[in-house]
Swiss-Prot record:
One Gene Ontology cellular component annotation held by this UniProt entry: extracellular region
Domain SCP: 67-211
Keywords: Allergen, Pyrrolidone carboxylic acid, Secreted, Signal
Full protein name: Allergen Tab y 5.0101
Family of this protein: Belongs to the CRISP family.
Pyrrolidone carboxylic acid: modified positions: Q17
SMART domains, per the entry: SCP
Length: 256
């Protein structure tokens, strides 16, 4: 019976996520002059989107590539690659449909500037990464995803131990924001959206990924240790330096 139960449990989780997305009044979440929530109001493309705007749907393969690439980087960092300290309790991240739905809504504005208010009832301070693309001809969805991942991966040359211990979005060698968010041990989930359009004779795209948490200035990106995953309850079978996806990490707690 076990092979049947597991998919059913996953289906229940997905249904609950979709129910939250469809029923939650995001307009009531923003207070204190933080502006309009990205999920507030009717969905649709803004006037900045030019012509032929459309939101691209991510297939299971697209989602798998995003998760595998991010988890592979987390796995490398957790074991102390690139001269960085070992991570004691960094988990495998999973796809979250609510974060993805809000990322999709953000891309429909066709501008990279992040909404100040994008939190949810489950994720109080989500991180966000935006990737802009300009080309004569629009590449495939998979190509856009790969390009974004490569951009973030190049920041391994910029990130340092000092940044891991006390986060800053940039160091002496350059920007580290994208990579630092992807390897935060407070991040438990990610969801992305993609919109493409034409403007000024050029093909344009905006890929946005929302993460369950964002890094706090001057606080650790992740907690270090003597050996990879030494504080995990159970390690992942594929990414052996990471905790399993079931590791009970609270994305709303701060690192100290």
């Amino acid at each position: 019976m076990a092979p049947i139960i597991v998919p059913c449990l996953l289906l229940v989780v997905l249904v609950l996520q979709c129910s939250v997305i469809n029923s939650l009044d995001y307009c009531s979440l923003c207070r204190g002059g933080r502006g309009e929530h990205v999920g507030c109001g009717s969905p649709g493309f803004s006037s900045d989107c030019g012509q032929k705007a459309r939101t691209r749907k991510f297939t299971k393969e697209h989602k798998k590539v995003i998760l595998d690439k991010i988890n592979d980087v987390r796995d490398h960092v957790a074991k102390g690659s690139w001269g960085l300290p070992v991570a004691s309790r960094m988990k495998v991240i999973v796809w979250d449909e609510e974060l993805a739905a809000l990322a999709k809504r953000h891309t429909q504005g066709c501008v990279p500037e992040a909404y100040k208010c994008r939190h949810t009832l489950r994720f109080w301070s989500p991180g966000q990464l935006n990737f802009e693309f300009y080309a004569d001809k629009m590449p495939s969805t998979m190509s856009l995803i790969s390009t974004a991942i490569k951009r973030g991966h190049t920041q391994k040359h910029n990130i340092t131990r000092d940044i891991i211990e006390k986060y800053q979005p940039a160091g002496p060698k350059g920007n580290v924001k994208e990579l630092a968010l992807a390897i935060s041990d407070r991040v438990t989930a990610v969801g992305c959206g993609l919109t493409t359009w034409k403007l000024g004779g050029k093909a344009r795209a905006l890929l946005t990924c929302n993460f369950s948490s964002e890094n706090d200035y001057n606080r650790p990106v992740y907690k270090t240790g003597n050996s990879p995953g030494e504080k995990c309850i159970k390690k992942d079978e594929t990414f052996k330096n990471l905790c399993s996806a079931q590791e009970p990490i609270n994305p709303n707690e701060h690192n100290f």
